[in-house]
UniProtKB/Swiss-Prot annotation:
Protein name: Phenylalanine--tRNA ligase alpha subunit
Obligatory cofactor(s): Mg(2+)
Catalysed reactions, semicolon-separated: tRNA(Phe) + L-phenylalanine + ATP = L-phenylalanyl-tRNA(Phe) + AMP + diphosphate + H(+)
EC number: 6.1.1.20
Organism the protein comes from: Methanocaldococcus jannaschii (strain ATCC 43067 / DSM 2661 / JAL-1 / JCM 10045 / NBRC 100440) (Methanococcus jannaschii)
Residues that bind Mg(2+): E409
GO MF terms held by the record: ATP binding; magnesium ion binding; phenylalanine-tRNA ligase activity; tRNA binding
Keywords, sorted A to Z: Aminoacyl-tRNA synthetase, ATP-binding, Cytoplasm, Ligase, Magnesium, Metal-binding, Nucleotide-binding, Protein biosynthesis
Cofactor note: Binds 2 magnesium ions per tetramer.
Assembly, per entry: Tetramer of two alpha and two beta subunits.
Amino acid sequence: MELHIDEKRLLKIFQDNNRDEFNLNELEKFMPKEKILRVSLWLKGKNLVETEEKVKKIIKLIKEEEFPERKIANYLKQHNIKEIEIKNLKDILPKEEINAALGAIKRKGIARIEKGKIIFDNLDYKDVEEQLLQKIKENKYLDDFSEEEKKIIDILKKRGYVDFDEEKEIKIKLTEKGKEFIKNPIEIEEEITQLTRDIIISGKWKKAYIRPYDVKVPTKPIYPAKVHPLTRIIREVKEILLAMGFKEVKSPIVETEFWNFDMLFEPQDHPAREMQDTFFLKYPNEGDIPEDLLSKVKEVHERCWKYKFDENVSRRLILRTHTTASSIRYLASLSDEEKNKPHKVFCIDRVFRNEAIDYKHLPEFYQCEGIIMDDNVNFNNLIGVLKEFLNRLGFEKVRFRPAYFPFTEPSLEAEVYLEGKGWLEILGAGIFRPEVLEPIGIEKPVLAWGIGFSRLAMLRYGLTDIRDLHKNDLDWLKRV
């Protein structure tokens, strides 16, 4: 049987002392306590020893000063008198000890209390409580006292002289297999557990026993510093899109309704623009917008939606509700020459919705938006790009179904298949409507899509509540 050198040392203690069992505190003179516990656990796994734990009640001395009744007797003895008026006890004892002294005198019968006086017949009386306190100094285990003594110990506890505590007694015993094992000589030879340069050069390794490593032994998990799970997904998506040839763009968090809604052909009376869905800035409450572009967008809205376009609504400042505003800003910034070139851009950033917080909604979350502009791109190209993107994210089964979005036509939703959960919606996409592109002078088709990171993170980490993604649960953050 392969034994560690410390296992051999512990078993040799049993062998040298011709004993089958030891208390832990007895073994501590041979080996440190922590090592004994660790080695005995190894030997227990090999069925060579067994351990037995017993919890013992111990008595702790809280104070060792004289009883107040003994203080009275000693005072009288010093003054060669045998009685004292109760009202004069304040000269001998603190106020809080007087009642305790009177109660003890009555209970023990060591003096008489008559006509407001305490009268002692014997100032050198014997007190079993004092004798027991002395015994407790020499023996702390409650089980070693008689039932009568335990009653007195309870009195001492009430008087605040002692208290109880618990102590574990651990016994390490040889099993039958262990007893058989120590019948044979146990040799403690030099053992090398870690090869060093000096050991190799000196040649010590030739004569010593080199302990083999068990690579299957469980080890304590190590939790190094980690990036937050949501940040990891954002970085992963960014790397995938950059590898697919996209360029990252940014736009402001605070937007005008013009860039967030009007430019995307969303009518000004659309429900999504109401207070319950959008955060409006109180101050400043209006922003600047390009007047020439405003007039073009106004003309498209009034011609197609048949309503009176309000320019003041367009100037209102809000927290952006989607990152599509980044895409449309990018397209509007292109020069005539740049409009003739293909473009692939994406934006990953925070968006805001005025929604009640629950298991699947937060007022602030991350979104990814991407567009592709080229002469010959079509709906099939959009499906192909999205399928490749989702495959790279680790979703093998992907399917698409028709959908409706105000600023794309045709539109679709992508679903991914997860074992045990079935098909789940993950992103929306489509081709920008001509009414979106007309005011900025773009005639080429533009493919667009968007994905929410919160939903993606929930799928990736198996969460059922989106709020868990933002909790300070260190155990979960260490594991994922």
